[in-house]
Amino acid sequence: MQKVVLATGNVGKVRELASLLSDFGLDIVAQTDLGVDSAEETGLTFIENAILKARHAAKVTALPAIADDSGLAVDVLGGAPGIYSARYSGEDATDQKNLQKLLETMKDVPDDQRQARFHCVLVYLRHAEDPTPLVCHGSWPGVITREPAGTGGFGYDPIFFVPSEGKTAAELTREEKSAISHRGQALKLLLDALRNG
């Protein structure tokens, strides 16, 4: 199996991606397990931040790297929290604090204006100086609820209602979520690109 460093310390992302990628002969190792510090996310887009993270991990470990940059974009908030999704409630942000801040921010937003999208950009670098990284983007439409529901997933999943499924992302099984989520879509594109050379 090819060892690949996953440029994240987010346990939820590691679990989700490692299980999906192991089927394709990739041995995913979290950068934290290799003593790699997080890259500074100075980009203004999901794509820029994913490339920064992958390049940093590949440079430090001399291994191929995969990085994920993802977040929630709420239409009525002009795309916020966007690239700041993980830090939306401030420097000491937690999933619960971020979720509560978003619900508070949107408390007066009518039900017909609560559309949002999860975005995920996955970047694969063959090596730190790779001039042609594979960049794959997935997006997942939904609606922000007024109260959390479900115990699965992580992040904003308990308040992200998926109309096609009739439940929140946190109420989906891992298999259901992987089949339709932003990360699942980006991963399918990445695996197709890896298969085709």
Swiss-Prot record:
GO MF annotations in UniProt: dITP diphosphatase activity; ITP diphosphatase activity; magnesium ion binding; nucleoside triphosphate diphosphatase activity; nucleotide binding; protein homodimerization activity; ribonucleoside triphosphate phosphatase activity; XTP diphosphatase activity
Coiled-coil intervals, chain numbering: none
Where are the catalytic residues? 69 (proton acceptor)
* GO BP terms in the entry: nucleoside triphosphate catabolic process; nucleotide metabolic process; purine nucleoside triphosphate catabolic process
The superkingdom listed in its UniProt entry is Bacteria
Explain what the record says happens when changing residue 13 to A.
Complete loss of enzymatic activity
Catalysed reactions, as listed in the record:
XTP + H2O = XMP + diphosphate + H(+); dITP + H2O = dIMP + diphosphate + H(+); ITP + H2O = IMP + diphosphate + H(+)
Q: What does this protein do?
A: Pyrophosphatase that catalyzes the hydrolysis of nucleoside triphosphates to their monophosphate derivatives, with a high preference for the non-canonical purine nucleotides XTP (xanthosine triphosphate), dITP (deoxyinosine triphosphate) and ITP. Can also efficiently hydrolyze 2'-deoxy-N-6-hydroxylaminopurine triphosphate (dHAPTP). Seems to function as a house-cleaning enzyme that removes non-canonical purine nucleotides from the nucleotide pool, thus preventing their incorporation into DNA/RNA and avoiding chromosomal lesions.
Q: Could you say which protein family the record assigns here?
A: Belongs to the HAM1 NTPase family.
The protein in question is named dITP/XTP pyrophosphatase
To which species is this protein native?
Escherichia coli (strain K12)
Source lineage: Bacteria, Pseudomonadati, Pseudomonadota, Gammaproteobacteria, Enterobacterales
Gene of this entry: rdgB
